């Protein structure tokens, strides 16, 4: 049954989509069957700065796949869409943690933003937004480096048009600590903003906005 539709439309009639492979560049999850099937999860990325793979979307009935996690400093992948008739949206992936700074004035890397939560169709709950990654710590040396900023938490997906709760908002990543120096210290990284909760359908609960994360700390100068 799946062979003709796979050939013509590049998508099976029924069945779950395959999970995306993890690696230097995380691959997107496959879409679920046109009539029934869940979307595959996105793959996690490992190469610095690369976003995670997006979650696959469902067809008529099924849940969206989860977005893959970002590599260091990379954004999380977006969650897949829930089924047009019935199904929940996929959760967004988590942003990667920023790299730590090295040596004099070595600034920490910024954390990656979370992935968007997938929305539902007619009936179903929205996917949760991904959390932002923490910022990297500043390097230590003659002059300390600044900590990296935390990534932004992402929006939760909208609930189904008829019934469904909005997806929970992603939390922002914590700012990185400042590096210590003999002559001067670096600045602490800012915490990332929290995402907004997803809208509800005709019947359902809208989620609140997530709170912002904490700023990094500044340690005592070593001079």
Model-predicted regions and their roles:
Residues 1-10, 14-17, 21:
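Amphipathic alpha-helical hairpins/coiled-coils and adjacent low-complexity
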């Amino acid at each position: 049954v799946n062979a003709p539709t796979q050939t013509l439309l590049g998508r099976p009639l029924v069945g779950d989509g395959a999970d995306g492979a993890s690696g230097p560049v995380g691959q997107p999850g496959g879409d679920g069957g046109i009539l029934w099937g869940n979307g595959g999860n996105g793959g996690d990325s490992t190469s610095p700065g690369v976003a995670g793979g997006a979650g696959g979307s469902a067809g008529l009935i099924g849940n969206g796949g989860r977005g893959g996690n970002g590599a260091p400093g990379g954004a999380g992948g977006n969650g897949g869409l829930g089924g047009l008739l019935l199904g929940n949206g996929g959760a967004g992936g988590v942003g990667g943690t920023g790299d730590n700074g090295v040596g004099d004035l070595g600034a920490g890397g910024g954390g990656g933003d979370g992935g968007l939560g997938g929305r539902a169709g007619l009936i179903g709950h929205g996917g949760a937004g991904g959390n932002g990654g923490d910022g990297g710590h500043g390097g230590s040396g003659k002059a300390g480096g600044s900590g990296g900023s935390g990534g932004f938490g992402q929006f939760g997906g909208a609930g189904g048009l008829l019934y469904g709760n909005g997806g929970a908002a992603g939390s922002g990543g914590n700012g990185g600590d400042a590096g210590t120096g003999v002559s001067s210290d670096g600045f602490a990284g800012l915490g990332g903003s929290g995402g907004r909760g997803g809208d509800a359908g005709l019947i359902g609960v809208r989620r609140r906005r997530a709170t912002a994360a904490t700023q990094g700390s500044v340690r005592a100068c070593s001079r």
